Amino acid sequence: MKELFKRGGIMLFDKNILQKIDEELKTYVDKDDKLYNASKHLLFAGGKRIRPYLTVVTYMLKKDDIEEVLPAAAAVELIHNYTLIHDDIMDNDDERRGKPTVHVVYGEPMAILAGDLLYAKAFEAVSRIKDNKKAHEVLKILSKACVEVCEGQAMDMEFENYYPTMEEYLDMIRKKTGALLEASVGIGAVMADCNEEEREALKEYAKRIGLTFQIQDDVLDLIGDQKKLGKPVGSDIREGKKTIIVIHALKTLDEDKKKRLLEILGNKNVKDEEIKEAIEILKPSIEYAKELMKQKTEEAKEYLKIFNKDRRKVLEDLADFIMSRIY
């Protein structure tokens, strides 16, 4: 019998599946030394496991032998954690998931190596896929996603020097955040022997949840719960991040509010009251972001209609969770 529990107010995560994913992940990092402990620091620090879970439940649209898909699911999560370790170094972040980041605890050189180790272990995981044809397809999807994540991160860093257009920003998040979510679903589809029509529908579903995932991150930074987020609310304002909310605001605000917002954005010495003031200025754009997420979530669920109603429900619920999650 499935044991489900709530996340973000939605009853959808199967504890048995999450446990199997964790057990699979442990087999890749089971040594006890500084390098492996650094690689495990974030991997078992309470992440949501959305990406490997997506791989498994996509696979379960058509198949039931979870053991077959676990190495593929683990590969996705190992890549995800590698990107997080390196992101934290590039962004100079001290905290993630309410804990000190890997480079803070182990130093930058060891953190870089820990990320590299997880990257290599992901391809070890792919090599455990028993069907060679599927392993080859998974390898193609995963390597393409890794390239796009790097391209997206580079774009994000370049945005520090100018204000991107909405189109540029959406392209960046499709790569930086969306690529690995798309890969998670695409890999599940390969492992499930989905046909071309099914794969295309799942690709469109994944594109939309990838977009809503990043937009919700941007929203939560402004109106989320600091304890649940594991980082200070408003940190994107302090850092001057060009989010979809900021880009929309700069297009739609009157000149006085725009001028005031630009004075606060990226000011490292900004006071808490000024952060609150900026959030107040951004409220209409936060609402715009929420409406866009609703639209994309409904579109995502529409693409699932070609699958069995009962089997697709968890993917529909995951789309809702990604939009409504609180951390």
Curated annotation (Swiss-Prot):
Quaternary structure and interacting proteins, as annotated:
Homodimer.
Q: What is its main location?
A: cytoplasm
Family to which this protein belongs: Belongs to the FPP/GGPP synthase family.
Q: Which GO terms describe its molecular function?
A: metal ion binding; prenyltransferase activity
Q: What taxonomic classification does the UniProt entry list for its organism?
A: Archaea, Methanobacteriati, Methanobacteriota, Methanomada group, Methanococci
Alphabetized, the UniProt keywords read: Cytoplasm, Magnesium, Metal-binding, Transferase
Q: What is this protein called?
A: Short chain isoprenyl diphosphate synthase
**Family matches, as Pfam families:** polyprenyl_synt
Quote the SUPFAM superfamilies the UniProt record gives: Terpenoid synthases
Question: Bound how, and how many: what does the cofactor note say?
Answer: Binds 2 Mg(2+) ions per subunit.
What organism does this protein naturally occur in? Methanocaldococcus jannaschii (strain ATCC 43067 / DSM 2661 / JAL-1 / JCM 10045 / NBRC 100440) (Methanococcus jannaschii)
